[in-house]
Amino acid sequence: MTEQTDAAMPIKFTDAAAIKVKGLLEEEQNPELKLRVYVTGGGCSGFQYGFTFDEKSSADDFVIEKQGVKLVVDPMSLQYLVGGEVDYTSGLEGSRFFVKNPNASSTCGCGASFSV
């Protein structure tokens, strides 16, 4: 498990996302939960983002801690997310976690899938 400071991170975890995760974890009353972000094959553009809560992390996972919560990314997914940002938005269209990914050459309309 690799933990780094804000300046040295290959991926960013915004305050908005961290605050939302913190609120969700307080509701669950499970301090072991972490937000896991991953990339899988699929979606309309070739790859898709996934978000889940996970109690475990592997020794080779990349971990960012902010606002007292942890974001976890496996090494395979991290290569597609370098330079990106995990954020959270809430608006008329609903609320969701999302990834701003500079490596994506195209994305689908919903923003859940991308190609490189």
UniProtKB/Swiss-Prot annotation:
Cofactor binding note of this UniProt entry: Binds 1 iron-sulfur cluster per subunit.
Keywords noted in UniProt: Iron, Iron-sulfur, Metal-binding
Keyword Oxidoreductase: no
One of the record's GO cellular component terms: cytosol
Gene Ontology terms for molecular function: 2 iron, 2 sulfur cluster binding; 4 iron, 4 sulfur cluster binding; iron ion binding
Keyword presence, Iron: yes
Gene3D superfamilies noted in UniProt: HesB-like domain
UniProt-listed GO biological process terms: iron-sulfur cluster assembly
Pfam families: Fe-S_biosyn
Binding positions for iron-sulfur cluster per the UniProt entry: C44, C108, C110
Needed co-factor(s): iron-sulfur cluster
Superkingdom per UniProt: Bacteria
InterPro entries cross-referenced by the UniProt entry: FeS_biogenesis, FeS_cluster_insertion, FeS_cluster_insertion_CS, FeS_cluster_insertion_RrpA, HesB-like_dom_sf
Regions crossing the membrane: none
Record function comment: Required for insertion of 4Fe-4S clusters for at least IspG.
Record text on subunit structure and interactions: Homodimer.
Record-linked NCBIfam families: iron-sulfur cluster assembly accessory protein, PRK13623.1
Family designation: Belongs to the HesB/IscA family.
Protein name: Iron-sulfur cluster insertion protein ErpA
Organism of provenance: Shewanella denitrificans (strain OS217 / ATCC BAA-1090 / DSM 15013)
